[in-house]
From Swiss-Prot:
It is an enzyme of class 3 (hydrolase). SUPFAM superfamilies: Composite domain of metallo-dependent hydrolases, Metallo-dependent hydrolases. Coiled coil: none annotated. GO terms for cellular component: cytoplasm. It comes from Bacillus cereus (strain AH187). Transmembrane segments: none annotated. This is Dihydroorotase.
Amino acid sequence: MNYLFKDGRYMNEEGKIVATDLLVQDGKIAKVAENITADNAEVIDVNGKLIAPGLVDVHVHLREPGGEHKETIETGTLAAAKGGFTTICAMPNTRPVPDCREHMEDLQNRIKEKAHVNVLPYGAITVRQAGSEMTDFETLKELGAFAFTDDGVGVQDASMMLAAMKRAAKLNMAVVAHCEENTLINKGCVHEGKFSEKHGLNGIPSVCESVHIARDILLAEAADCHYHVCHVSTKGSVRVIRDAKRAGIKVTAEVTPHHLVLCEDDIPSADPNFKMNPPLRGKEDHAALIEGLLDGTIDMIATDHAPHTAEEKAQGIERAPFGITGFETAFPLLYTNLVKKGIITLEQLIQFLTEKPADTFGLEAGRLKEGRTADITIIDLEQEEEIDPTTFLSKGKNTPFAGWKCQGWPVMTIVGGKIAWQKESALV
């Protein structure tokens, strides 16, 4: 099916939002211009809505295989499509871990069979993510590994991390890291700060993250490796990454929507839906994340979509697993709380969710260019809705944002020229 989207707006190559039509033919973007006509295409009047590149998320947890009670490739990718994401990168903390040919082939077959959006799987750095034996990077790359990470745990052994970075560098691949120094975690369930003190909870100190990042940055410099830092959350981490970039070290970084919108002061009670790792930090950390995003220290936004069951989250803040679901709330949360408040521009938000992650990892995604695969998201910037977890397509309903009123909701998502999801009656 060919589609002609009429009367839309998009961000052009100069970074300006302008009026446009867009023609999709044979799964590709055939033309982006005003006043397009086509005889062999279904016309969809978007009535002034935003035509954006399909969103790109380099940090997601789909749980399959092994955690299908939390999420599946099918439910997770449907949720991604509803959130406007057309390319997502799946972390390897599944069971089994994609750490060898057999496991990666099985995962890729599942993706091919079930996924509603483009899914790029990470390969594990170490066997079973146990930190003691390196995986076969060459084989995992051959089978389509996006990059290498043990996300969910930090690689504690410096010699292992250095060896991994050297091998990844030879393959022109990135090492991606969840950064925690295990000796400083302190069995914490929240940030070590005012909230932990008030509620008598063990806290995770900020330095637990930043000291690990500092170590890895020096290792990346020694290995001449592209090193990407997951979900930055502290002022110290931002400072270390900024200094590394100024020194010419190949480091990039991401931040989550929840760390841009919330800090520990926003946690109303010991609610496990506010429990994520890294935890919500202090006000100064929150301000540093915004500053880092604006000055280029932090390169992109990634959701860290981490679904869990209601039963798991009901165990209380100390025992419940870390993580919140993120696909279906990301854009409206960021648009409402950053763009509408004048903190960043709409153009910047689009870049942080599309071309920045795509360019960082060399993906042919993130831009509406003629000849490229038609991965497109239509967004109604005027539509206001209340976040209602019962409507999520994800199995995970675990969100701290229930009841928040937000503007800027995706209404249609196109993947490879085909409609992957659309809001009923939104485009008529």
